[in-house]
């Protein structure tokens, strides 16, 4: 399934739950969404990153439109590196499905020491991205852009 579609499906599921703070769920993209929620609080705050700039969401190409889009480019590159690790060679170790352990406290994400090598790498990709999102301004003009002309 396309990662962007999975993200939208996750958003619908979370919306149906009617909660603004969801504990980590057994699905990686929900975990990443919860990490973003930790660092950028607000009801479903992570949804606004699903179709931002040239790199946030499925795929990515061209030059990032701003600092936030650069966070997504770095995150994409981190996932590419994860897929090259021998420890992440199994289909169940794909960055899009691998489950990992982490904590969220006071807008800070910490990957737990009990993660295996692959889970630790992917958790760190997501942790760095979530903190990068929190440190980067969000420009509504870069949401749902025409990537064929701007990227």
Swiss-Prot record:
Q: Where in the cell is it found?
A: Secreted
Any single biological process term in GO: phospholipid metabolic process
Q: CDD domains in the record, alphabetically?
A: PLA2c
Residue numbers annotated as active site: 75, 126
For this chain, one GO molecular function annotation is:
calcium ion binding
What UniProt keywords are attached to this protein's entry?
A: Calcium, Cardiotoxin, Disulfide bond, Hemostasis impairing toxin, Hydrolase, Lipid degradation, Lipid metabolism, Metal-binding, Myotoxin, Platelet aggregation inhibiting toxin, Secreted, Signal, Toxin
Q: In which tissues is it expressed?
A: Expressed by the venom gland.
Reactions this protein catalyses = a 1,2-diacyl-sn-glycero-3-phosphocholine + H2O = a 1-acyl-sn-glycero-3-phosphocholine + a fatty acid + H(+)
Pfam families named among the record's database cross-references: Phospholip_A2_1
- Where is it chiefly localized? secreted
Q: Which residues bind Ca(2+)?
A: 55, 57, 59, 76
Q: Cofactor comment in the record?
A: Binds 1 Ca(2+) ion.
| Disulphide connectivity of cysteines | 38-104, 54-151, 56-72, 71-132, 78-125, 88-118, 111-123
Q: What is its EC number?
A: 3.1.1.4
The cross-references to SMART domains, in alphabetical order and at most eight, read: PA2c
Q: Which family does it belong to?
A: Belongs to the phospholipase A2 family. Group I subfamily. D49 sub-subfamily.
PANTHER family the UniProt entry points to: PHOSPHOLIPASE A2, PHOSPHOLIPASE A2 FAMILY MEMBER
Protein name (database record)? Acidic phospholipase A2 1
Organism per entry: Ophiophagus hannah
């Amino acid at each position: 399934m396309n990662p962007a579609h999975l993200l939208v499906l996750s958003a619908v599921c979370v919306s149906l739950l009617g909660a603004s703070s969801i504990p980590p769920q057994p699905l990686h993209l929900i975990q990443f969404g919860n990490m973003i929620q930790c660092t950028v609080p607000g009801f479903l705050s992570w949804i606004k990153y699903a179709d931002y700039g040239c790199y946030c969401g499925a795929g990515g190409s061209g030059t990032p439109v701003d600092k936030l889009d650069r966070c997504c480019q770095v995150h994409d590159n981190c996932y590419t590196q994860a897929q090259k690790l021998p420890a992440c060679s199994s289909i169940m170790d794909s960055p899009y499905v691998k489950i990992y352990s982490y904590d969220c406290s006071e807008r800070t994400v910490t990957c737990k020491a009990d993660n295996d090598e692959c889970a630790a790498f992917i958790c760190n990709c997501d942790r760095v991205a979530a903190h990068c999102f929190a440190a980067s301004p969000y420009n509504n003009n870069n949401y749902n852009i025409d990537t064929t002309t701007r990227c």
